Amino acid sequence: MSEAGEATTGGTTLPQAAADAPAAAPPDPAPKSPAASGAPQAPAPAALLAGSPGGDAAPGPAPASSAPAGGEDAEKKVLATKVLGTVKWFNVRNGYGFINRNDTKEDVFVHQTAIKKNNPRKYLRSVGDGETVEFDVVEGEKGAEAANVTGPDGVPVEGSRYAADRRRYRRGYYGRRRGPPRNYAGEEEEEGSGSSEGFEPPAADGQFSGARNQLRRPQYRPPYRQRRFPPYHVGQTFDRRSRVFPHPNRMQAGEIGEMKDGVPEGTQLQAHRNPTYRPRFRRGPARPRPAPAIGEAEDKENQQAANGPNQPSARRGFRRPYNYRRRSRPLNAVSQDGKETKAGEAPTENPAPATEQSSAE
């Protein structure tokens, strides 16, 4: 009985223990080596193998969930490709407009960032009103939008006429050193007329013709130290030839002008090189005063005699107007005659007392 009871109890307890074993297995998983289990196992991700610097393993499902969200934002659903349409209107300042599809007559929103090939001459991306363009239709937040906008067959778009053009850069304008202009009109004539040693201008047959040949600058240029004229002196009205300093090689026979005081005539007219220089006003030589007429000299003597020695004489250098002098000549002549008679009488009266005194003695 005891053996049978033990057998029965053992038989009843074994199935219960076996039933409890699978229930307790999940919460306590034992690590098993790959060699122990015959089933192949998937390789662990690199993030789990490497782990974080703190020793904790990085969570695996987080990157998988974020990747689809970023892909949805980056890529929009394409509804149609290579669709032709006509620009309904486009605002250059705001940077958006609408394109009317030729196939479905539907208005599609277009932004300036969707323009793939812009006009290279335009500064801003834009499409012109009524222009035919080719684009892709994608699904946007508020409806259909245009993407990859180009001209027909992938050519650049024409752009709006209200869009600003790019600045035209002239060749050599910014790279040119600041200094005097290359040549003046007056210098061209002098350089063409004169002859210099060792300078033979190359023949330009067939290279330029007509007006272009006239506008072409000569090959020879004087040294920089002799071309220090600012460029804004080109349009002034004074004679530019007087400011040109002759080249030493040009001072040959036939080119040297008349010598005045050991200096060529052309160098006497040269102005100061400083554009802000203003020469001081120099008073010229005193003009020779004309000799006074006989009548005027007598008139002055009579005036001094009438005024007496105590009265100051008239201010030296005083000149009467020319018209007044001409009008007063006949009057002066009459007065001179009267004064001359008085002057003649005075000396005759003076010697009379002298004779009387001599006789009395």
Swiss-Prot record:
Single Gene Ontology BP annotation: negative regulation of skeletal muscle tissue development
Compositionally biased intervals (Polar residues): 303-313
Positions of region (Disordered): 1-74, 173-361
InterPro entries, per the entry: Cold_shock_domain (IPR050181), CSD (IPR011129), CSD_CS (IPR019844), CSP_DNA-bd (IPR002059), NA-bd_OB-fold (IPR012340)
Tissue distribution of the protein: Expressed in oocytes, spermatocytes and spermatids (at protein level). Expressed in skeletal muscle, kidney, brain, spleen, liver, heart and spermatids. Isoform 2 is preferentially expressed in somatic tissues.
GO cellular component: cytoplasm; cytosol; gap junction; nucleus; synapse
Record text on subunit structure and interactions: Found in a mRNP complex with YBX2. Interacts with RRP1B.
Protein name: Y-box-binding protein 3
Record organism: Mus musculus
